Design a protein with these regions (language model features):
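N-terminal Rossmann NAD(P)H-binding glycine-rich loop of SDR-like oxidoreductase domains
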Residues: 4-30
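NAD(P)H-binding glycine-rich loop region in Rossmannoid oxidoreductase-like domains
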Residues: 39-106
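Conserved Rossmann-fold NAD(P)-dependent oxidoreductase catalytic core, especially the SDR/UDP-sugar
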Residues: 84, 88, 93-164, 188
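Active-site Tyr-X1-5-Lys
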Residues: 158-187
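Glycine-rich "substrate-gating" loop/helix at the edge of Rossmann-like oxidoreductase active sites
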Residues: 160-163, 197-206, 221-236
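Glycine/proline-rich active-site loop of Rossmann-fold NAD(P)-dependent oxidoreductases
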Residues: 181-185, 197-212, 245-255
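Alpha-helical substrate-binding/gating segment
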Residues: 213-223, 228-255
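Mid/C-terminal beta-alpha module of Rossmann-like enzyme folds, strongest
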Residues: 239-278
Length: 279
């Protein structure tokens, strides 16, 4: 699927990862239908408008709500590819069902249900997570070679234990279930590890990944950072992976997207070296 004549839809287009996907699409000359909560909130979309001025593609904004049925119908019309990135990533929550599970699960249902109604849709690229594959290192003990692969599913997360991982697992399983019930569009899923890297909009840093870096720098972890290995990947590489998933005809199934393993301590040391503050 290499034609750039048809439109593409990006849900949650002003988000951390989604903004990089939109930028890539505009550079390549696509027309992007971008859904956001409020298309009239210029502060949230100004960086995307600046991309449109710089690159050869075009962008059209639509207001949409993950929890409202038919909310994506208008934005999806005449689109051949859907990038469904919109889903909450929060670690500090009070109500996991309302804040995480409902938006992730119902949002997936609503976007995919709209896709079933729109004849132009040929492929959906879903942003999932390695969190849909495992909760923590304890799960690896029961895996062959202690290895997580694209065949691995999270079996331990719940509403009360790692609800974010639970929300990603439920949403992705629902996506595959809906995919198997139809034959008009293909599904490719990207499962990144911890996504880090520059934020495309310097004035709007509302991302859990950015919050983590802030906490490392603002003294939140001054007593000590968690001794925990973690896989990380550059946000720009994840955006490129989404693009390849959409336009590479051989792309199918799930793709773990992770660059290397590190730790919070190593990330802290790297940040320290970049800002030139002595230890």
């Amino acid at each position: 699927m290499s034609s750039k004549q048809n439109n593409v839809l990006v849900t949650g287009a002003n988000g951390y990862l989604a903004s990089w996907i939109v930028k890539k699409l505009l550079i390549e000359g696509h027309t992007v239908h971008a859904t956001v909560r409020d298309k009239h909130n210029k502060e949230k979309i100004n960086h995307l408008l600046e991309y449109e001025k710089k690159y050869k593609g075009n962008i059209k904004f639509f207001s949409a709500d993950l929890l409202k049925k038919n909310s994506f119908d208008e934005a999806m019309r005449n689109c051949s590819i859907i990038f469904h990135t919109a889903s909450p990533f929060k670690l500090e929550i009070k109500d996991p069902v309302r804040e995480l599970i409902n938006p992730a699960l119902e949002g997936t249902k609503n976007v995919f249900t709209s896709a079933n109604k729109i004849d132009s849709v040929k492929k959906i690229v879903l942003t999932s997570s390695v969190a849909a594959m495992y909760t923590d290192a304890s799960e690896c003990k029961n895996l062959i070679n202690n290895e997580i692969t694209e065949l691995t599913w999270n079996k331990t997360a719940s509403i009360n234990y790692q609800p974010y991982s639970y929300s990603k697992t439920l949403a992705e399983k629902e996506a595959w279930s809906l995919y198997k019930k139809q034959s008009k569009w293909e599904l490719v899923v990207i499962n990144p590890s911890l996504v880090l890297g520059p934020f495309p909009n310097a004035t709007q840093t509302t991302s859990e990944s950015i919050n983590l870096l802030k906490q490392i720098g603002d003294g939140t972890f001054k007593i000590g950072v968690p001794k925990m290995p973690i896989g990380v990947v550059d946000v720009r590489d994840v955006a490129d992976a989404h693009y390849e998933a959409a336009f590479n005809k051989k792309a199918s199934g799930r793709y773990i997207t992770s660059a290397y393993n590190t730790s919070f301590l190593e990330i802290s040391k790297l940040l320290l070296s970049l800002i030139h503050i002595s230890e």
